[in-house]
């Protein structure tokens, strides 16, 4: 039992580490905890600043690659046992999601299409019913054991359509004026020789306002999580061994 648990936890952690291909995430003020939760198993969230800020952030020294993502939390839907996290990304600049989905899907993600996580119930006709609309699903990903299993991925051009659809059937997920320019995070891969913390300081020096932005270091989250899980598994193995001996 302990061995199987270890394998399952390690599989989940490996999936998470592959997903966290960025060294640094820049997020809006007061949203660091929400962003960290999205990287593990937290609740779906909606938060954003605007594309002009994202464009400025990308000008900092020490950045090898940068890409934007937009997060939308849906209401409970027929397709899902839990709230759905909608993740908008830019396939042209992305280096985080594409490598992770490459084994399941090849080709461009067209406007209006979705890639679904493992726990999302896709209809027999290959669609998901969300906000009163049927969205075509081009691929469904393997189980990761993380919150990504309750997520769907869309391209950034589809985000305004999603916002408009939400307004027709429920509370609008964000103001219409922001639908085409909302960015939840800038995912950054640093240049060789640059620490993520150094790049964060470079970003802050670009504009005094950027000192108030949130800075998340995904590598630290996975390292801490793996350490905690290793300790948990050790305790569980001891517990299972004691129970087994007592049973004998």
Residue ranges and their predicted role:
Residues 24, 172-204, 213-214:
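A short beta-strand structural signal in non-transmembrane regions
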Residues 20-22, 62, 82, 112, ...:
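Envelope-exposed proteins and targeting segments
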Residues 40, 142-144, 188-196, 219-222:
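Structural beta->alpha junctions
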Residues 69-72, 77-92, 97-171:
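Hydrophobic secondary-structure segments that place a key small or acidic residue at a functional site
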Residues 34-38, 145-147, 224-226:
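A short acidic, helix-capping loop that chelates divalent metal ions and anchors anionic groups
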Residues 9, 13-16, 33, 196-246:
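Peri-transmembrane interface segments
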Residues 51-54, 156, 160, 200:
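Extracytoplasmic/secreted envelope proteins and their assembly/folding machinery
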Residues 3-85, 205, 211-213:
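Hydrophobic, regular-secondary-structure patches
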